[in-house]
């Protein structure tokens, strides 16, 4: 796959450093995604139709946030080593399969990306170089996920 390659060392360093600054904000990140995009929240059977403000501080919400945002953290952690590329592809492929069965769309992944990027920008020193690194990280992830969604 000619489009699949690891990010360069500089990009990995930037992505990992900016991720580290927010990596423990799982509940706040998921809350921000759901608040901005109720259509994403509606895809979660445990939360569909519920008041976001009422569920934000519940154990169920914290567990889901940890699982969802933790997955993203796992991807970020694996970046940068050519030895991890097969593991990254498997992780992303499996994520694509799971989300395809739930009817998640490419547009909803785009909404997640948009909200996650805004959250990262708001909690880090941000510049065009960091933005480019994150664009590459999302592009690499989504190339595998979208391949599955389109199959």
Curated annotation (Swiss-Prot):
InterPro entries, alphabetized: Erythrocruorin, Globin, Globin-like_sf, Globin/Proto, Mb-like_M
Gene3D superfamilies cross-referenced by the UniProt entry: Globins (1.10.490.10)
Residue stretches making up the Globin domain: 6-150
Pfam families with a match to the protein in the record: Globin
PROSITE patterns documented for this protein: GLOBIN (PS01033)
Assembly description: Homodimer.
Descriptive protein name: Globin CTT-X
CDD domains (alphabetical): Mb-like (cd01040)
Extra information: There are at least 12 different components in Midge globin.
Lineage, opening ranks: Eukaryota, Metazoa, Ecdysozoa, Arthropoda, Hexapoda
